[in-house]
């Protein structure tokens, strides 16, 4: 693969990142934010696997960092709104999954920000940390919790919040935005992990595209039933 093919189209990638931010901030059905992330993640993985230290790559890293910080700020704002409702059992079970996904993504960003001479070590650190943070099980657990499959979570996340908020649309919209954000950053870190290990990214991408369609339908169904 030639160096200039790594980005496919840097401007298109940049627009994709901006689109993610816009969707998180404005879309009424927050799950729709998940859709643009797949193309963005694929481009980022190629950049990480075939590191090129040039001006365009550095600019791309800075722009992605800015988008991530803005997404995180939105997520934190939603967290404050959701703290009005206490659901101790679900929140306690869900907290570890959320923290693991956030940590996995932070370690992935360290690869993006690494100097060429440190890149290999950062990749190794990322893989080790990813495994220590329960590998790919966080995303599957989050998916099962949203879809209502009873494994780690004693009750489906969306059902519990619906009950305790009495179907408040704003609360549920905030929750869906927060969950969509976690799926976005979790997917990027997950694909980075699979990519570094040499896994079949195409089949993994297809699997999670289907999963995210299911999540989107579930969230839209819940939001339609709100007051």
UniProtKB/Swiss-Prot annotation:
<dbReference type="GO" id="GO:0033333">
    <property type="term" value="P:fin development"/>
</dbReference>
<dbReference type="GO" id="GO:0016020">
    <property type="term" value="C:membrane"/>
</dbReference>
<keyword id="KW-0812">Transmembrane</keyword>
<dbReference type="InterPro" id="IPR039051">
    <property type="entry name" value="SE-CTX-like"/>
</dbReference>
<protein>
    <recommendedName>
        <fullName>Protein rapunzel</fullName>
    </recommendedName>
</protein>
<keyword id="KW-1133">Transmembrane helix</keyword>
<feature type="transmembrane region" description="Helical">
    <location>
        <begin position="179"/>
        <end position="196"/>
    </location>
</feature>
<keyword id="KW-0472">Membrane</keyword>
């Amino acid at each position: 693969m030639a160096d200039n093919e790594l980005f496919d189209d840097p401007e298109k990638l940049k627009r994709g990142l901006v689109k993610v931010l816009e969707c998180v901030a404005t879309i009424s059905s927050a799950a729709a934010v998940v859709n643009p992330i797949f193309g963005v993640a694929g481009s980022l993985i190629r950049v990480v696997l075939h590191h090129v230290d040039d001006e365009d790559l550095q600019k791309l890293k800075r722009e992605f960092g800015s988008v991530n910080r803005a997404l995180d700020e939105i997520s934190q704002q939603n967290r404050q709104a959701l703290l009005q409702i206490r659901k101790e059992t679900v929140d306690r079970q869900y907290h570890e999954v959320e923290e693991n996904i956030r940590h996995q993504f932070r370690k992935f960003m360290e690869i993006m920000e690494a100097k060429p001479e440190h890149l290999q070590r950062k990749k190794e650190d990322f893989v080790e940390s990813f495994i220590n943070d329960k590998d790919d099980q966080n995303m599957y657990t989050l998916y099962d919790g949203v879809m209502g499959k009873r494994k780690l979570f004693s009750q489906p996340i969306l059902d519990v919040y619906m009950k305790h908020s009495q179907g408040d649309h704003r609360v549920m919209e905030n929750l869906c935005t927060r969950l969509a954000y976690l799926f976005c950053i979790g997917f990027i870190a997950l694909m980075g992990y699979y990519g570094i290990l040499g896994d079949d990214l195409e089949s993994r991408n297809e699997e999670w595209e289907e999963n995210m369609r299911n999540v989107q339908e579930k969230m839209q169904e819940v939001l339609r039933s709100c007051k």
